[in-house]
Amino acid sequence: MMQHKEIKHPYQGIKYTVLVVIAAFRVANALTTKTFFQPDEYWQSLEPAHRLAYGYGYLTWEWHEGLRSSLPPLVGAGIYKALQLLGLDDPRIVRIAPKIVMALFASAGDVYTWKLSARLQGPAEAPWALFVSLLSAFNWFFLTRTFSNSAEMVLTAVALNYWSFNGKEVNFKRLSVALFIGAISCVLRPTNAILWAVLGLHLVLTTTAKMRVLWLAVRNVALVFAATYYIDYLYYGEPVFPLLNFLKFNLLQSLAHFYGTSPTLYYFYEALPLLTVGWLPLTLWGLWINRSQVLVKAALAVVVAFSLIRHKEVRFIYPLVPILHMAAAEAITQTPKKLRKWLVWSLALVNILVAGYFSQVHQRGVVDVVEYLSTEPQVTSVGFLMPCHSTPYQSHLHRDIPVWFLTCEPPIGFTAEEQMTYRDQADQFYDDPLQFVQTQFPESVAVSAREARTPLFHPSHLAIFESLEKKSPEVIEHLVELGYKRGKTFFNSHFHDDWRREGDVVVYNL
């Protein structure tokens, strides 16, 4: 069980060779992941980092509004600068290097899930917690991607390992480390504060050293926030409070729903199965066994809190994964030995198959097309005539040439009435594709990017989804009249929840 009282045993020290194997496993994971999941993997970390290091790239509206911490792009820019100094900044290496660094960091998530299980559960459960973490389909698909949520999960796993769960036996040195790392995770994702608020309240209520715990919390959180404020000030060039701007955007202006809303119970019936995949039945059993433990209660509180927010995404509760994997490990040890081997490997196989498909097949065309455009000599300019942020950008293209895509900024500064009728640029295109291309582009392909009076121009290479060919053939006819020819195609997906992104990715070139 997830005991409040810590367990002392050999698993608290992990052999160096095991760490190397886990790190190598995650590097292989990162380098073999060929698909696209969500735009933030590129646009909120690698893209601003690329702009900072190389002087070109695109900053989305979040950066202009000061909603994001500068820590992720600063780390990325450091990687890119190192490549420059070593003379290794060719497109392929520029794409691979951040993956390797993220993979090494991600491996700490596996290690500290193991260590946390060893500390709170025991030597029987700890190896299974590591096993579940390594053979988790969602971990394989998501953990090594450059999302702030991935870093948030790793930092949460590390901080939990240092946390004091027994108020009667508080280790203040370890608690100080936990608070420091937990505060950094909140800088990356402010909503992670929900988890730490629940755990902190439990600790304060159960310890006799209340004032000392509170003082440690205030000191460490203030130290982290002061340091990151200074770093953000240097990055933005002016006083910026990303946390306050984040709260203003999501709570006061309530604009997050512009990017979609989900039913109240989404996290229970969809997100939890996505996070656990084949391990779901064991996870639910383990959570039930440990329903009285503070970590399980904290996880439930986080899910309930997120359920009250209209805009929901599975990655928002990703920091709970170590707790879910520990629950699955608990259930495995409770399974009769005669059934255990068959059950565990059957569920592991489900995870392996799901991980393979979604990391190798589903939505790979939008990544492949950018890698193709980055190396094709005849490419002098690029346009992405598809929903906004459908592909990586300069972090993968790595060519200082004119590039555009259809934008989708939210209605910031609009009245409630204006928000109801607001249509972003991508919406305007799909409302009437032919009219859009006839009115928003220069009349002739002879008009260069520099000469065009609008942000959109006729590029040498234009990427679209196959669905546009099928649903708006008149647009294709117009492109052909301008001199475009159908070129390379890239398989993207067998199915998609957005009709605009259905089918292959097709390149048209002059």
UniProtKB/Swiss-Prot annotation:
Mannosyltransferase involved in glycosylphosphatidylinositol-anchor biosynthesis. Transfers the third mannose to Man2-GlcN-acyl-PI during GPI precursor assembly. The chain crosses the membrane at residues 17-37, 96-116, 123-143, 145-163, 179-199, 221-241, 269-289, 316-336, 342-362. GO terms for molecular function: alpha-1,2-mannosyltransferase activity. Glycans are attached at N290. It is an enzyme of class 2 (transferase). Belongs to the glycosyltransferase 22 family. PIGB subfamily. PANTHER family: GLYCOSYLTRANSFERASE, GPI MANNOSYLTRANSFERASE 3. The keyword Ubl conjugation does not apply. GO terms for biological process: GPI anchor biosynthetic process. Signal peptide: none annotated. It is found in: Endoplasmic reticulum membrane. One of its GO terms (cellular component) is endoplasmic reticulum membrane. Pathway: Glycolipid biosynthesis; glycosylphosphatidylinositol-anchor biosynthesis. Its EC number is 2.4.1.-. It is a multi-pass membrane protein. InterPro entries: GPI_mannosylTrfase (IPR005599). Its main location: endoplasmic reticulum. Keywords: Endoplasmic reticulum, Glycoprotein, Glycosyltransferase, GPI-anchor biosynthesis, Membrane, Transferase, Transmembrane, Transmembrane helix. This is GPI mannosyltransferase 3. It comes from the Eukaryota. It holds the Pfam family Glyco_transf_22.
